[in-house]
Amino acid sequence: MGRGRVELKKIENPTNRQVTFSKRRMGLLKKANELAILCDAQIGVIVFSGTGKMYEYSSPPWRIANIFDRYLKAPSTRFEEMDVQQRIIQEMTRMKDENNRLRIIMRQYMGDDLASLTLQDVSNLEQQIEFSLYKVRLRKQQLLDQQLLEMHSRVCNKRIYRFSILPYLIHYIEIIKF
């Protein structure tokens, strides 16, 4: 019968933690050695203890420094470091391409550069322009409705004001007549 799983959490007792680290470190290095022998793999393991002490293992005949150098020179995109300048150039190129694409679209919206478009492209462009025109007209109508409401409100307020002071005006006119 196998052992139960150990709950993975930090061991609070420093002595127990150090003993567990030592045993598990030895087990890890043993597994690395077995993998190197069985699969003829170049393996390097670097482990730092909780106190900062470094332990390392490298599969014979390699040294850890050789394996680490090989790791740094690996042609994988995960490990390659791109030069900052190269990244900036790539981003600038991407942005220029995007800018050119958007300029072409804008010229097409303005009715220019249509010669390169297919019938389907022209139909799609027409639908997009019609939809844009619909949205513009809808917004225009909203603004006109808003202005109409504001003007109506002002007229009503002026009428109320006139009617509220009308009795006083009539009274003063009658006083002036006498």
UniProtKB/Swiss-Prot annotation:
Residues 1-61 form the MADS-box domain. Its main location: nucleus. InterPro entries: MADS-box/MEF2_TF, MEF2-like_N, TF_Kbox, TF_MADSbox, TF_MADSbox_sf. It comes from the Eukaryota. SMART domains: MADS (SM00432). It is found in: Nucleus. CDD domains: MADS_MEF2_like. It holds the Pfam family SRF-TF. Residues 85-178 form the K-box domain. GO terms for molecular function: DNA-binding transcription factor activity, RNA polymerase II-specific; protein dimerization activity; RNA polymerase II cis-regulatory region sequence-specific DNA binding. Keywords: DNA-binding, Nucleus, Transcription, Transcription regulation. One of its GO terms (biological process) is positive regulation of transcription by RNA polymerase II. GO terms for cellular component: nucleus. Probable transcription factor. This is MADS-box transcription factor 31. It comes from Oryza sativa subsp. japonica.
